[in-house]
Amino acid sequence: MRTEYTDFAAVWTRAETIPGWLTPAQARVLWDAASNAEPGSLIVEIGSHQGRSTVVLAAAARAAGATVAAIDPFVDGAMFGGPATRDKFEANVEAAGLRDVVRLIAERSTAVRPGWDEAIGVLYIDGKHDYWTVSDDLLWTRSVVAGGHVLVHDAYSSVGVTLALLRHVLAGRSLRYLGRTASLARFEVVRPAPADRLRMLRELPWWLRNVTVKVALRIGRLFGHHTTPDPY
């Protein structure tokens, strides 16, 4: 079954039923970025889980004449579920009528990247959140076309993600910071100006606030208090 989605509201009605951490406002950012992809271009997603973000990207990609490469190794673990999560991902993409525009690559992004030779129009990074993996995932930006967009989830929320951005983007010369929607940061592949770097630095108080809240939640759990999940 092939399904056409004419607007964001239509695809979000489908995507919001899929478990995940992407908010409606962040999903709209993905939709807008993918909708502006060039016909025939490729959108790469690193970290797909059960397909919540994949469905949004793929629906917009179809309308734009683009395709999506979804990269996720579907490893075992309490948060991820291994092969069972892959089954759910494939079922969700199929149920959304988007299977024909999604190419699943069930491998680690760090293993796929060295041999990658395709140009990327939009890159969405939401894989493993440790500093070293995110640092490697940011190397995928070398394949993004000039003027293309890079979206990074859990920026200024995850310690590993944020440190990697500060080290490789703030100090780099190829990505311009455009802003964020909660923890979803937006970048453009273009040489940044000093004002762009300053804009990134201004986000640090929000990051420190998030780290403080996360630490407080963990301390609270030690004393038997169970509250909402970590802020994203």
Each predicted region: which residue ranges?
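S-adenosylmethionine/decaboxylated-SAM
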Residues: R2-T17, A27-Y232
